[in-house]
Amino acid sequence: MNEKNIKHSQNFITSKHNIDKIMTNIRLNEHDNIFEIGSGKGHFTLELVQRCNFVTAIEIDHKLCKTTENKLVDHDNFQVLNKDILQFKFPKNQSYKIFGNIPYNISTDIIRKIVFDSIADEIYLIVEYGFAKRLLNTKRSLALFLMAEVDISILSMVPREYFHPKPKVNSSLIRLNRKKSRISHKDKQKYNYFVMKWVNKEYKKIFTKNQFNNSLKHAGIDDLNNISFEQFLSLFNSYKLFNK
């Protein structure tokens, strides 16, 4: 994604009142180190530096980097990096959290990047509401990949009126909490295969008819359109047993 396309997709929240309402749902303290995805004009960055130990803002737009630095001139616990988040290398040897009001058009790429390429223990993102709902939909491959690594929660609605320019849809503040991976390293490839066959409804490629019926019964599934992640893991574990 080049700089021009990302700039044209940005929607800013600048009202102190609205920012404060969002920040009340984010667990931060003076010991936290934060990576901010897209500092924009620095309005959220300012709130973060006042609450946290250190903030690293990653912003692809050079002009917005300067705007953010000027807004934070009275603070020294931050740095603004003029980089593309999709190319950024997160540290592997320190504790940190991530916050971002991320562009709608690259939300999937960003969320994959930060879940699979960072070690952040808590991630807070403002995303399009429909996208947030898809992250909780076990009929979606992205949701099934993410749920193996993080617990996903929708914390609050963020009305479209908060933004400028005003988008056509509302947004949500979501939280991703890191957990011990539910899939062992040796099973990752097998899990990826199972997920893709499942979401494409290619059941015959992963189960015989009897295996499928027994697996559904063992998982307590009555409706294929309404299964929990735990039930999905039960299906995957059955698949592994049948394919030792």
Swiss-Prot record:
Assigned EC number: 2.1.1.184
SMART domains on file: rADc
Enzyme's top EC category: transferase
UniProtKB keywords: Antibiotic resistance, Methyltransferase, Plasmid, RNA-binding, S-adenosyl-L-methionine, Transferase
Record annotation: effect of changing residue 165 to A: Decreases affinity for S-adenosyl-L-methionine 6-fold. Reduces activity by about 96%
A GO term for molecular function: RNA binding
Consequence of changing residue 112 to A: Reduces activity by 90%
Catalysed reaction equations from the record: adenosine(2085) in 23S rRNA + 2 S-adenosyl-L-methionine = N(6)-dimethyladenosine(2085) in 23S rRNA + 2 S-adenosyl-L-homocysteine + 2 H(+)
Gene3D superfamilies, A to Z: Ribosomal RNA adenine dimethylase-like, domain 2, Vaccinia Virus protein VP39
Impact noted for substituting residue 133 to A: Reduces activity by about 80%
Classification via Pfam families: RrnaAD
Binding residues annotated for S-adenosyl-L-methionine, in chain numbering: 11, 13, 38, 59, 84, 101
GO cellular component terms, A-Z: cytosol
Impact noted for substituting residue 140 to A: Decreases affinity for S-adenosyl-L-methionine 7-fold. Reduces activity by about 85%
Result of altering residue 112 to D: Decreases affinity for S-adenosyl-L-methionine 5-fold. Decreases affinity for RNA 6-fold. Reduces activity by 99%
GO biological-process terms attached to the record: response to antibiotic
SUPFAM superfamilies reported in the protein's UniProt record: S-adenosyl-L-methionine-dependent methyltransferases
Family to which this protein belongs: Belongs to the class I-like SAM-binding methyltransferase superfamily. rRNA adenine N(6)-methyltransferase family.
Job description of the protein: This protein produces a dimethylation of the adenine residue at position 2085 in 23S rRNA, resulting in reduced affinity between ribosomes and macrolide-lincosamide-streptogramin B antibiotics.
PANTHER family: DIMETHYLADENOSINE TRANSFERASE, DIMETHYLADENOSINE TRANSFERASE-RELATED
This protein's name: rRNA adenine N-6-methyltransferase
Organism: Bacillus subtilis
